[in-house]
Amino acid sequence: MSVAILGKGKKVALKRRHARIRKRISGTPERPRLVVTRSNRHMVAQVVDDTKGITLVSASTLQADFAGFEGTKTEAAKKVGELIAEKAKAAGITAVVFDRGGNKYTGRVAAVADGAREGGLAL
């Protein structure tokens, strides 16, 4: 994966970090990749098998489960982690490789990981 990303700025740094991470991280059928995507308002978590190129399970703050959710964005991110762990365990997945998607491992990204660990996933 050759990505020529030049310049400075938050989005450029995000793309550079993501490209660097993806060179080393890949999901397998035994240990798929837990991808975390963060926007200003929402969090999305997907468990992906990279050998087949398919999403096995996903959870997001856009789902109906979060329709009446009141709390901080960090609390919502933790709930997304718990929800993805519940769905992954139902699909027979117990261990995943964590892909922070170029985001720094703090705040909402770390909350998703903590929620997934509390839900029973091995990261």
Swiss-Prot record:
SUPFAM superfamilies: Translational machinery components. One of its GO terms (cellular component) is cytosolic large ribosomal subunit. Pfam families: Ribosomal_L18p. GO terms for molecular function: 5S rRNA binding; structural constituent of ribosome. The keyword Electron transport does not apply. One of its GO terms (biological process) is translation. It comes from the Bacteria. The keyword Protein biosynthesis does not apply. Coiled coil: none annotated. Keywords: Ribonucleoprotein, Ribosomal protein, RNA-binding, rRNA-binding. NCBIfam families: L18_bact. Part of the 50S ribosomal subunit; part of the 5S rRNA/L5/L18/L25 subcomplex. Contacts the 5S and 23S rRNAs. This is one of the proteins that bind and probably mediate the attachment of the 5S RNA into the large ribosomal subunit, where it forms part of the central protuberance. Belongs to the universal ribosomal protein uL18 family. This is Large ribosomal subunit protein uL18. It comes from Bifidobacterium longum (strain NCC 2705).
